[in-house]
A protein has these predicted regions:
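Extracellular glycan-interacting surfaces
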Residues: 1-213
């Protein structure tokens, strides 16, 4: 996936590229040419077939906003020939969620961490964790009211455990975990950085919107 979606100096990408020879050569999936900012992609086993999911967002580039029309979670069931956007709209807005991160749980459940959408919205859609068992119907498992970018990690050995790190105003605003597959969440203390020259929990150096990569 191409495009640097994290920052005002974002470089616009050219969609998703595919290799069938171990990375020796690549071809663009033509259906993704307008996926300007690809944040993540995964292939999920669905009834024996590989289904491709691509996390996309819009961003400001060259004096204008690009990618809003294709932001969200793009799903392909035919090897990338065509895609459909499967995330729901942000509540109260006509724009769907933008996806920052995609994870697949040990039970094959999909977890998506959102990020903020384009300016001009009352609710820009950040700070959410969305889950799905079929890839098309979604549940909001967690909302952090001031959150922006969300990164998720699922325990590979226990379907009940997942963790999320949530950015707000360039800082790590919260770390949360679930021990019951997303039904409830609790806070986790931020780790203390070994660098004594900064505040103990500033491991992202005030760039959590970027340094979570």
């Amino acid at each position: 996936g191409t495009g640097e979606g994290w920052g005002a100096g974002a470089a616009r990408g050219a969609g998703v590229w595919k290799s069938t020879n171990g990375g020796t050569s690549w071809t663009q999936l033509s259906a993704t040419s307008s996926f300007y900012y690809v944040n993540d992609l995964v292939v999920r086993n669905e009834s024996g077939s590989g289904v491709l999911y691509v996390a996309t967002r819009g961003n400001y580039y060259g004096q204008s906003w690009h990618g809003s029309a294709t932001q969200g979670l793009q799903r392909s069931t035919n090897g990338g020939v065509s895609f459909s956007q499967v995330l729901p709209n942000i509540p109260g807005e006509s724009q769907n969620f933008a996806a920052a991160d995609i994870e697949i749980g040990a039970d094959n459940k999909l977890w998506v961490g959102t990020t903020t959408s384009s300016y001009g919205l009352t609710d820009r859609g950040g700070g959410r964790i969305l889950t799905s068992t079929n890839g098309t119907t979604w549940t909001t498992a967690y909302t952090h009211s001031s959150g922006e970018r969300v990164e998720v990690a699922c325990a590979p050995s226990n379907t009940n455990y997942a963790y999320a790190l949530i950015e707000a105003s360039s800082q790590v605003d919260a770390i949360v975990k679930t021990t019951n597959n997303g039904s409830t969440w609790s806070s986790v203390s931020e780790p203390s950085d070994a660098d004594g020259g900064i505040s103990s929990t500033d491991f992202s150096r005030g760039q959590a919107w970027y340094d979570l990569i």
